[in-house]
Amino acid sequence: MIVPAGRPGPAFYLAGDSFPDDVGVERALAPRLGPHFDGWVGQAALADIPGGFDPAIAARAAQLEAALPEGPALRRVVLIGRSSGARVVTEVACRRPVQAVICLGYPFRRPGGPLEPARFAHLSGLAVPTLILQGTSDAYGTPTAARFHPLSPHIQVQALEADHRLRLAAPDWDAACRLILDFCAHAAAPHDLTG
């Protein structure tokens, strides 16, 4: 199936387990990215769905899937997630062919914990164009460590000078959002999802 080019959107943003403590990430992204999409659905809006904010991965995935449009409109959606929100959006994208996925601080491995394939095994089969922005001092996995996991060829990993909390100065957020917008523009170009 050929996906037509066009303006991306809406964008759906999912925070990490620490929501609302990590709301600063969405506050940095929304004003920089929102105007470039046909709508912005943030974590607070998703949490207002009956059931509220449930940190469980399966519950959040079901909540997100219920909020997504059906039919051709789905292929214009961009999913953005931070930390566990990144895990949710990638799992959903394995089932729902959206236009692009953006991950910030993907939680590859709990600090000091054992490998948990449930965190990353699905990434090997992800067919949606995906950008992972990973902090060089992220305790859940650096960009170098990320490349040792089985990643689909549709996934790109870019380094950010940051930790897992993504405490970035305004110019660094500007640069990160330019990367995201460039990636989404490329993903919006016509491409065949059948091959």
Spans of model-derived segments:
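Serine-hydrolase catalytic machinery in alpha/beta-hydrolase-like enzymes
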Residues: 1-78, 87-91, 119, 168
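Short, conserved loop/helix-junction motifs that constitute active-site signature segments
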Residues: 6, 96, 120-127, 149-153
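Active-site nucleophile loop of the alpha/beta-hydrolase fold
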Residues: 16, 45, 103-111, 135, ...
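Catalytic histidine neighborhood in serine/cysteine hydrolases
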Residues: 38-40, 152-166
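Catalytic histidine-centered segment of alpha/beta-hydrolase-like enzymes
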Residues: 51, 162-175
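Primarily recognizes the serine-hydrolase "nucleophile elbow" in alpha/beta-hydrolase
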Residues: 67-125
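Short beta-strand/loop motif that positions the catalytic acidic residue
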Residues: 125-127, 132-134, 138
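Conserved alpha/beta-hydrolase "acid-adjacent" motif
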Residues: 139-144
